[in-house]
């Protein structure tokens, strides 16, 4: 189902601020929240380092129906896939039908910081796919036409790379998985999820996009409408090969926006995210936010920064850019606002923008 949701930035705001924002978002009519999952923030100045899993439990308790998805949890090093499966199963028991998991191949700021290596993107995607396999086995996740990892076709150039995978589930539901990177032995979630938890994967490279199509319920991408056609063609093709119904899979965007009647204030409020415009920002082996921030100041121009964010002085001016995302094929759009006054943004967006799209969808 097409939806416009809210984005909660764990790196930019305190836990209490985000609780206030999301409570306001629910009152305003938003039904789901996508939220980041970092150890370090993208920028040192005014950065925060909230533990997302704790925050999700706190905010779910303080809201009534709002759904929460991580965007994304790195299933590569610092989080063991068994612990991810256990944590989100427990959240789903407490808040059934309101919890989703987004996974990805991580950033150096969160993995290298805690003593782990930073290998190639190819290896990180391989690790992520193994993690997905373990999580789904432990959840006993139901899905039609699900491919086991050893049968994967997501990386045709490495057809034999996963040939040593060994996975089994006994009659009592105990999982044993011997992989290239991860191993669990006779593991069972004694507190299993109460629902079929949605599972998504972030990706921009070929291998990650194919893996998202074959192994998860949808793709999270930072691609913009004008550059996403090839991404979606690759995603749809991989889904068809896996005998999946492409119409059942989500294509998720999270456009950055900033609103203020004063353009200069709206632009200034985007500064925290300048680091994300560094070349290869998501792959670069820099784990210190201070270094990232200084590098961004040197290398990312104001013009580049302005192009990275939809900056508006009238809230209605967000309608056209959002329509472009929908026309490009995105099914869910999470609005990543970095506005100077976030509460004002939420209230105005809910009065002027959300009703426009809901009326449009009703008539369709």
Model-derived features with residue positions:
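Active-site-adjacent structural elements that line small-molecule/cofactor binding pockets in enzymes
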Residues: 1-364
